[in-house]
Amino acid sequence: MSGMWGNKIKISIFGESHGNAIGINIDGLEPGFEINLDKVSSEMKRRAPGRSNLSTPRKEADEPEILSGFFQGKTTGTPLCAIIRNNNTKSKDYGKLKDIMRPGHADYTGKIRYNDFNDYRGGGHFSGRITASIVFAGAICKQILEAKGIKIVSHIKSIGTIEDKSFLDEKITEGFINSYMSKELPLIDELKEEAMRKEILLAKEELDSIGGTVECAVLGIEPGIGNPFFDSVESTLAHLMFSIPAVKGIEFGRGFELTQMRGSQANDSMYFSGEKVLTKTNNNGGILGGITNGMPVIFKVAIKPTSSILKSQNTVNINTGEETVLEVNGRHDPCIVQRALPVIEAATAIGILDLIEN
């Protein structure tokens, strides 16, 4: 089923944007791991809306209620289930949209797939709201990985045409690792922040939206993790990335840029650092043959512009069979790239932990 994923670490998500709650069930966690709930809360706040004028004013407490699998501060080893209540919904904003298909959304595809029984309010089960559950699960997986010496970090690589530097070219410093989570727009080159803010606010002023890219790195991962072909590190992470609404592309290392290189440029020269084998460059993103080589796993994800915009758009009324003009009301993000970072990190943590445990 589409709501389930995993081999050793199995997750199952449920709920709709305007339902009573959303939630997740996590199976396969080892017993006795102490979960820092403050760290979980910090991750949830990074994804939550309403932090500034760069995101939707819709505010949700996003406080997970753990129902099972957690006792006296530690995992029990049985399925860990949690829900997150939906407290700030305006379903009336969607009453007129039952038959009018919103461009860029899954209204039409969901209606067809579920024979018109889908909950269309706020996108229902297709909503980015559901990613709050993924962030909760990922926050736990991140803590387990950190106990193994593995850290996952990310930054905004681009907003529109404004580009930040890359993890492939810049050393990921302890200063960045310790501070990026507290920033609304985590960047390597902080001089780009003002231009990115202006780009987002310009899209908002024009009743439009804008997309961008996020670059993610897995640090401290040992060589030999993963499998060739169908269960490769790339296919595992790509599977999870494309489960995030708005993700439309992924590339590992230099990705598509490799197509413009010669083999002598693309190949990462190897050398010894003590007993470790490292590479002088990381063009392949720390993965060869679907298996980690000991270098940081680095990949970039493309986030499309928010589909809900206040500009008029041409669409269809599926009930009357007529073409019509859609004018959307409600509370929407001019850009979701900055809110996608913790979701991408969370999905990465789930995938990497599953690969290690499996």
Model-derived regions: residue spans:
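N-terminal, positively charged regions that mediate nucleic acid binding
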Residues: 1-58
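Glycine-rich anion/phosphate-binding loop at the beta-strand->alpha-helix junction
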Residues: 14-20, 207-323
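A short glycine/serine-rich beta->alpha loop
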Residues: 10-15, 118-130, 223-227, 282-287, ...
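Glycine-rich, mobile lid/loop segments that gate access to catalytic sites or pores
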Residues: 113-226
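Internal helix-turn-beta structural module
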Residues: 10, 82, 306-358
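Glycine-rich, N-terminal phosphate-binding loop and its surrounding beta-alpha-beta segment
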Residues: 43-103, 107-109
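Alpha-helical support elements that line or immediately flank enzyme active sites
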Residues: 20-32, 129-150, 154, 231-239, ...
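Short acidic, glycine/tyrosine-flanked loop/strand segments centered on an H-E-D-like triad
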Residues: 98-124, 316-332
